Amino acid sequence: MAVLTLDYRCCDRKRPLYIKHIEVERIAATARQQLVADSIDAVSFDALRQISGLKINGIDFALEVSTDYAVHDEQGNHVFGVCEFDPAMPDAAMVSISPVGESLSELLALSTLAHELGHAVFDAPGWVVQGSKGPGLFDDIEPTMQRAYRTTTPDSEHLSKALSAKPTTEEHF
């Protein structure tokens, strides 16, 4: 089980701070170096699936990866994958990818898993920090609702570089 350790420029809420494409490429190269030897041509689906934890900008959290079950959005539509944070599990992010089948080829599954791991690297640290905050000095002691987060990859168009692709939406529950 692999734990990726990565750092990038971020704000005090642990969200990326003006990261350029070249910096994302450097971060991806650092992740690749931690997952496979230089002699390996490509990172495999299994290597990505075995990532069990992330340490991003000093924030440690577990990563649960599921590739066994079909994934659906809130409306019940089949989607390729999601990256989620549930405040009931404050030290973990979850990545779920629909299994290879009619609508998802092996290559699309690999691309979707890498894409959702990108959300785990760049979005989840902020979610974990936000989820760990308790009430402030002047807040009510009564339990308050905590926010869950989800990013969704609905289809292959979302993974394309085309300008027509819809941007990722972050959903709050």
Language-model features: locations:
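A metal-dependent hydrolase signature that marks the N-terminal structural subdomain at the beginning
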Residues: 1-84
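Short helix-to-loop capping/linker segments positioned immediately adjacent to catalytic or ligand/cofactor-binding
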Residues: 35-37, 101, 108, 162-165
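Polar/charged alpha-helical tracts
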Residues: 26-29, 46, 87-88, 139, ...
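A generic helix-loop boundary/linker signal
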Residues: 18-21, 164, 168
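Active-site scaffold of zinc-dependent metalloenzymes
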Residues: 61-113, 117-138
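Post-HEXXH active-site segment of zinc metalloproteases
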Residues: 111, 122-166, 172
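Generic hydrophobic secondary-structure packing signal
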Residues: 24-27, 110, 170-173
